[in-house]
Amino acid sequence: MRINMVRQLSISRAVSQPELLTRKGVSFLFLLFMVVLTAPNAMSSEFEVQIQSLTAVDRQYMTEQRKTVEGLANRLGRRVSGIAARDLDTLQEIIDRRWVDAEDVQTQQALGIVFGDLLAEELDFDWVIYRDKKGRSRALRYREEDIYVFPITLISRRLSAGAALSVESLFEEQLQKQRPKLPGARWMPN
């Protein structure tokens, strides 16, 4: 028995075997891919500062950080009281005793949170999330004004660099720097 094969009638390739990616298709996908990859960079150069309220996670994290400092203060027979003169002295004692290593960024930041709480109380600032093209930070903000302080960074950068740090001097420096920026500053006592 012999089988005769008959050739298929000629029809266009598009109908008989559609190609998934033609050169035009590959070029289009490459162009689309490049646009998607470069879009965030284009936007980041125009990225404006975004301010948000603290999230529940931020508040919980900051509470835990305060507990870390409270534990260090307890080793001195003290507690974090919210009274600037006492707490600044406590922070200074913790730093002077070198209880926080230069590599222990988390505890350094905990000290910055307590330091920030004292500034916030003195200047009537609130904790917010400050997001810019460099990243996300916890910062202090005066009401709805564009007046910010970054107390966590103020402390942690100095400690991680091993720089001498006078917490009280830094506190006074920030008060002197921020008070003139506040609305009604002309009438505020120094």
Give the ranges of each region predicted by the language model.
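Boundary at the C-terminal end of the N-terminal hydrophobic targeting segment
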Residues: A42-S44
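Solvent-exposed, acidic/flexible segments
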Residues: D104-Q108
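Sec-dependent N-terminal signal peptides
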Residues: R23-F33
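A recognition module on extended beta-rich or small alphabeta surfaces enriched in W/G with H and D/E
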Residues: A139-N190
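N-terminal secretory signal peptides that target proteins for export/translocation
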Residues: M1-T22
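N-terminal low-complexity, intrinsically disordered segments
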Residues: F47-E103
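Amphipathic protein-protein interaction modules
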Residues: Q109-R158
